[in-house]
Amino acid sequence: MDELKNIIRDVPDFPKKGIIFKDITTLLADAPSFQRMVDLIAHRYVGKKISKVVVVEARGFVIGAALAYKLGAGVVLVRKPGKLPSETYSKTYQLEYGSDTLEIHTDAIAKGERVIIADDILATGGTMAAVVDMVEALGGEIVECCFMAELEFLGGRKRLPEGKVYSLLTF
C-alpha cells in the first residue's frame, strides 16, 4: 500500500495554517494507481450482494461511482441542500465550528437494501455519522463504511458503527 500512500500529496497550511492536507487528486490523476485503489476496495465486497453504493459529495462521488461500477451496484448521491431535484430526507449535524446539512432522495434506498457508504477520507467522522443515520432512516442495511484513506489521529472511526469501517490506507 505504500506505493499508493506515496502518491497522495501533503499540502501544508491548507485549508488553514497548521493543517497538513492530504491531497488525493494526485492519486486520482494517476490511472494505474486509481485503478488499483478501486480494485482493492471492490475486491472486499465481491459476493456480498451490494445493491447500492451511497456516495458523499464531492470527492466521494469519484471513488464511489467507480466502486459501484465494479460491483454492478447503483449509486446514491448524498448532497448539500437544494441540489437534489425530488423529495429528500435531510440531516443536520454538528461540525467543530457550526453545523452542516446533507440530503438524500427519500426513494433512493429500499428497506433492507444492502449498501456500502463510500467517501475519500475518514477524518473526524461527523459527515459519515450523519450519512449512516440517513441510510438507516431510509431502511438500508449498512454493510460497511469504506474510505480510500483514514486520518487515524482524528479518531473518526469511533463515531461510526463498530466493526463496519474499512479504510484502504491509513495515515
From Swiss-Prot:
Stretch forming the signal peptide: none
Pfam families xref list: Pribosyltran
Pathway terms, separated by semicolons: Purine metabolism; AMP biosynthesis via salvage pathway; AMP from adenine: step 1/1
Keywords (A to Z) from UniProt: Cytoplasm, Glycosyltransferase, Purine salvage, Transferase
Enzyme nomenclature, EC number: 2.4.2.7
Primary location group: cytoplasm
Enzymatic class: transferase
UniProt key word Glycosyltransferase: yes
PANTHER family reported in the protein's UniProt record: ADENINE PHOSPHORIBOSYLTRANSFERASE (PTHR32315:SF3)
Protein name in UniProt: Adenine phosphoribosyltransferase
GO MF annotation: an example: adenine phosphoribosyltransferase activity
Species, as recorded: Geobacter sulfurreducens (strain ATCC 51573 / DSM 12127 / PCA)
Function, in words: Catalyzes a salvage reaction resulting in the formation of AMP, that is energically less costly than de novo synthesis.
InterPro entries documented for this protein: Ade_phspho_trans, PRibTrfase_dom, PRTase-like, UPRTase/APRTase
Entry-linked HAMAP family: Aden_phosphoribosyltr
Cellular location(s): Cytoplasm
NCBIfam families from the UniProt entry: apt, PRK02304.1-3, PRK02304.1-5
GO BP, sorted A to Z: adenine salvage; AMP salvage; purine ribonucleoside salvage
Protein family according to the UniProt entry: Belongs to the purine/pyrimidine phosphoribosyltransferase family.
Lineage: Bacteria, Pseudomonadati, Thermodesulfobacteriota, Desulfuromonadia, Geobacterales
Gene that this sequence comes from: apt
CDD domains: PRTases_typeI
Subunit details: Homodimer.
GO cellular component terms attached to this protein's record: cytoplasm
Catalytic activity: AMP + diphosphate = 5-phospho-alpha-D-ribose 1-diphosphate + adenine
